[in-house]
Amino acid sequence: MSKLNKKTFFIILLLSSLVSCSTFDSLRFWSNDDDVDPDEPKELLSFNEQRNINIEWDISFNGVNDLGSFKPGFSSENLFFADAEGNLISVQSSTGKENWKKQLNFLSSGVASGFGILVVSDIKGNVIALNQNDGSEIWSTNVKGEVLSTAAIDPKTVVVKTGSGELIGLEKTSGETLWSYRSKLPTLTIRGSSSPVIFDNNVFVTFDNGRLGVFDINSGFLLWDGAISYVSGTSELDNLIDADADPVVDGGLVYTTNYQGKLNIFDIAQKRSVWSYDVSSFFSPVVSRGMIIVSESNSNIKSFSAKSLEESWSNEDYLNRELSNPASFKGNLVFGDFEGYLHVIDPLNGKTIGRKKISKKPIKTLFSRSNSLYAIDEAFNLFSVSI
């Protein structure tokens, strides 16, 4: 099983499209001014500003955040964040003032926080639990595989998923392995991984084979699963259907997306898919204000009525601008892009109502909590933002 990071994957995809062209004229790289390259990032359009964006504080870390998999953890009034070089810090979420910091080995994923502990994973396959108060190590367990996504924590169990598709339950106080499940992976996958989600004593997780699995958290027993989409191409690239987005559990339903696949809604009680729509996405959908909103892999944004499931609006203003994950914040929809902009969109009509450039680097991840929105760029700069 081979892993491609997203940048490498898109380069390969571009090269394969060039090889298929029979003449240089068909490439049209130097054609007249009336021609528009459909793969070029769309220029930003003017808009009617209704929201102001302000940076409350920012902290710079080390390394390259190319996958956007490093997310902050929270507990009470504190924020915990780590970079790829193992710098772990606790700060006051309102001011950014440092509480404590700790140096760890090179890390492969961000910080999970819950029930008095922090959990991180390093590049050697070690899952490490630390005390939230001072960063002291509680336990470390090697799971024999790199963990590329944030762990999930409940009162008794820490759940992690490795890049090789293994889901593992660890005892929260000791790190002892309680159970494991290995999914069947395709030959080629995109380097990235969704995080498990714990809800009502069950673990919901999506895999690189394009399936959703639901497990009992105590035993690791597979309760039910279903395909988000099926392969339909003739080549390995065509058959990439990685589900790198965390499932969203809301109102008895599970919302899932995958690459070159679908937005698929599963009913938990019925244990099956009840609706799907063809999309290609690396990000979890946003379910907010009666809308289901998904950012596609080409940065087109689509929305659906959560009640009727009919398509509502579509926004192509940000095509190929490498949008970050969407975040719902104070009734707004927020995205980052490859030029370091934050964009605020009205989720009811898809219109842009706010914008600000906060970084010289691409914005990779957005995370909202309480009255603050947090943005993380490719250079591991962490911004606390208010709107």
Language model: regions and residue ranges:
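Bacterial N-terminal signal peptides that target proteins for export
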Residues: 2-9
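Structural signature of WD-repeat beta-propellers
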Residues: 83-84, 122-123, 162-163, 207-208, ...
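Short loop/turn segments that connect beta-strands within beta-propeller blades
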Residues: 92-95, 131-134, 171-175, 216-220, ...
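Loop/turn-rich, solvent-exposed surfaces of beta-rich toroidal or solenoidal domains
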Residues: 294-302, 310-344
